Regions:
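Short catalytic/metal-binding and nucleic-acid-binding patches
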Residues: 1-177
Length: 177
């Protein structure tokens, strides 16, 4: 079994990718967005953290969090969010023998990707990645049209223009990005 080593910076800012176990076609996260939001809210009440940026796609999500000073326990937060969400779902998913033996649901991948944000440039690059993701995956043509993202918050704060990442149109023909 691989030995995963996670970077833990107390009070740090982190980028995450969290995936459903069965990715395609699966719209569980957007179909149950209110359950996901409530799961996050409940965890934030008990284990505070700031959501700097976030996008929820049908089968995975990306988030940037900043943890409180002296706190580096993002893994427990994700574990608890996944548990709350899973408990709210009807148990209809396929579960492998291993998951059955361990008493696990078959909703989430066990692990998640994390990256410690190094500086302002790294933060900005990951915010761009978060917000362009619905376009990258073909869910919308314009970033501003995806409803499950912090993009509108960034526009309201003057960080992005409303038409950010939209290709220019010349005589009705879409241009390159």
């Amino acid at each position: 079994m691989p030995d995963y080593r996670r970077v833990r910076v107390p009070g740090g800012t982190y980028f995450f990718t969290v995936n459903l176990l069965e990715r395609y076609p699966n719209d569980l996260l957007v179909r149950h967005i209110d359950v996901l939001r409530e799961s996050v809210r409940r965890v934030r009440c008990r284990y505070p953290f700031h959501i700097d940026a976030c996008v929820v796609l049908p089968d995975h999500l990306h988030a940037i969090w900043t943890l409180p000073e002296g706190d580096a326990d993002y893994a427990d937060r994700w574990r608890t969010i996944k548990q709350h969400f899973s408990r709210a779902m009807a148990s209809t998913e396929y579960r492998s023998e291993v998951r059955q033996r361990r008493g696990e649901r078959g909703i989430w991948q066990r692990r998640f990707w994390e990256h410690a944000i190094r500086d302002d440039r790294d933060f900005a690059a990951h915010c761009d990645y978060v917000h362009i993701n619905p376009v990258k995956h073909g869910h919308v043509e314009r970033v501003r049209d995806w409803p499950f993202s912090t993009f509108s918050r960034f526009v309201a704060a003057g960080i992005y223009p409303e038409h950010w990442a939209e290709a220019p149109s010349i005589d009705g023909v879409q241009g390159d990005r």
